[in-house]
Design a protein with these regions (language model features):
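Generic N-terminal simple sequence motifs
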Residues: 5-6, 197
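N-terminal leader/targeting and accessory segments in enzymes
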Residues: 6-116, 120
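Phosphate-binding loop of NTP-binding sites
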Residues: 42, 80-84, 95, 99-216
Length: 216
């Protein structure tokens, strides 16, 4: 379900600085991409509510940023209850959390829009100062990292600021927030694509498909 509370979801008329301001962003999973989402959202004026199974997860974040609250619980069902109770506006879930898990199921029934870090990064990119800088995306079962690094090297050899991001390098949302890029070479796993809805790359490649990661 998608909540319209507090002006969410945004329209394309929202500016780069206004997209997250005064809204609540819920983050499930404080891994590398989850921490990046929390930092970017909080620094852009959002209230951040984060959830993680590990005790102490996000402690540094909540100390660094006043508008970040963190709920932790090693019991998946108890943490799922916290998500259902406290999640608001927009929810960004870790790509490592499977759709069959209690946490994903709790997030999916909360009165929020659930998206990936990649999707949020695209929405920021689309209204930001680098909106004209293309994304070149690569997915597939095998060879993604090698190919995306080759792509970034080709672009950089032409003098472009074109980092490899996504499932390799820095989280995409961090790079979009920092800005200054001419193009992005983006590695996307199937997990990252699962809740990615509106990304429009200039070009994309699916390298291959094979039976892998079937326990997700």
């Amino acid at each position: 379900a998608c909540s319209m509370r507090n002006g969410w979801p945004p329209t394309m008329s929202d500016s780069f600085s206004e997209l997250l301001a005064s809204r609540t962003v819920s983050v499930v999973g404080l891994g590398v991409s989850g921490r990046a989402v929390a930092k970017v959202a909080a620094r852009r004026g959002a209230k951040v509510i984060a959830f993680d199974a590990k005790a102490g997860a996000g402690e540094a974040l909540s100390k660094e940023l006043d508008n970040v609250s963190v709920f932790t619980d090693a019991d998946p069902e108890a943490l799922a209850d916290k998500i259902r109770t406290h999640a608001r506006d927009l929810l960004v879930i870790s790509p490592g959390i499977a759709p069959t898990s209690a946490l994903y199921q709790a997030a999916s029934v909360a009165p929020v829009e659930m998206i990936s870090e990649v999707e949020l990064a695209w929405r920021l990119h689309a209204v930001g100062p680098n909106a004209a800088s293309p994304w070149l995306t690569i997915t597939g079962t095998d060879g993604k990292t090698t190919t995306v690094n080759m792509l970034a090297s080709i672009l950089q050899a032409q003098g472009l600021n074109a980092p490899a991001v996504g499932n390799v390098g820095k989280p995409i949302i961090q790079v979009v927030d920092e800005g200054g890029y001419d193009a992005l070479a983006v590695e996307l796993s199937s997990f990252q694509l699962h809740l990615t809805k509106s990304v429009e790359p200039l070009a994309s490649i699916c390298l291959n498909l094979a039976a892998d990661h079937l326990n997700w």
